[in-house]
Amino acid sequence: MTDRTAAVTRETAETDVAVTLDLDGDGEHTVDTGIGFFDHMLAAFAKHGLFDVTVRCDGDLDVDDHHTVEDVGIALGAAFSEAVGEKRGIQRFADRRVPLDEAVASVVVDVSGRAVYEFDGGFSQPTVGGLTSRMAAHFWRTFATHAAVTLHCGVDGENAHHEIEALFKGVGRAVDDATRIDQRRAGETPSTKGDL
């Protein structure tokens, strides 16, 4: 099987980001964005998706969390797009419902080459740790755009920590399922068009 890894860097006046991704990893992760709860969520994504991930971001957190979260989403999405490559043999579609106590996240993904993001729901508290709750949805919108995937997400619950964590775990599981190699496809692109 082809090596499905990528390394992406992004440097702007607002952030300096470095990301590595291995789609066929073991869930190993090293994450340092300066936002503890966001680090925890990226670790949950890696662990539950069985992706080996490193993320380092030095951002302008003295302004707010927006640039850091968005630019990590850009870099991780770009790394995903590079790592998945021509998408030969992948499952392509997947869906997961993941609970965390009272909260439930629903995730549907199509590794389609088309960037679409829909989010249904909201977060019960405006912040969790140093993360503005709505930035969790914005992160996945940014990821979907730069990964060129269709991603439909929803959350329901009473505790924003649980809602966001269920969302990150759910995306990890769904993306892992969608990128798994199906031996029956024998390296073919999963599309009637022959290309994604």
Curated annotation (Swiss-Prot):
Keywords: Amino-acid biosynthesis, Cytoplasm, Histidine biosynthesis, Lyase. Its EC number is 4.2.1.19. NCBIfam families: PRK00951.2-1, PRK00951.2-4, PRK00951.2-6. This is Imidazoleglycerol-phosphate dehydratase. It holds the Pfam family IGPD. Gene3D superfamilies: Imidazole glycerol phosphate dehydratase, domain 1. GO terms for biological process: L-histidine biosynthetic process. Its main location: cytoplasm. Belongs to the imidazoleglycerol-phosphate dehydratase family. It comes from Halobacterium salinarum (strain ATCC 700922 / JCM 11081 / NRC-1). Pathway: Amino-acid biosynthesis; L-histidine biosynthesis; L-histidine from 5-phospho-alpha-D-ribose 1-diphosphate: step 6/9. Transmembrane segments: none annotated.
